[in-house]
């Protein structure tokens, strides 16, 4: 019987603080990302090749309203193994400019970089693009309720999101 052997290295206890949530998201059309460069170990992104003149756009939102969740799907019987990543965002105050952007995002095939609350950048779309899988516009009922658009971007890739070297971000975003 053949076995799928992997080199295991272990994970030691990390005693540093680990903050939940995300701070920002950077989006581009997936087709405009022509390639990524990995470090020598093949585990961290150290560069992007973009279409001429194209950069990732920054999407900002209020604190504690965005998240990134990656879920492994594995089936030993079929040999299936992939990771679904969902990036959920809330943009407060419904208005025309945001409605237009939400409509564009709902129809786009996207490349996604997420900045988490620990200051680490993650590229969620190394193998396949992300697309809108859910969204809403809501006014709320009471004065204190949220008035906002929400959007979930979903991608399916061969592995969990790749970390992006922070030095690269300034060269590929605007």
Predicted regions and their residues:
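N-terminal alpha-helical "arm" segments
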Residues: 1-23, 170-174
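Generic structural motif
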Residues: 11, 16-18, 30-33, 64, ...
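Solvent-exposed edge beta-strands and adjacent loop segments
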Residues: 13-84, 129-143
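Generic detector of bulky aromatic hydrophobic side chains
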Residues: 15, 108-109, 149
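Well-ordered beta-strand positions in beta-sheet-rich domains
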Residues: 58, 121-123, 150
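Structured, beta-strand-rich domain cores
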Residues: 63-127
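Mixed-charge, glycine-accented linear interaction segment located at domain edges/termini
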Residues: 128-174
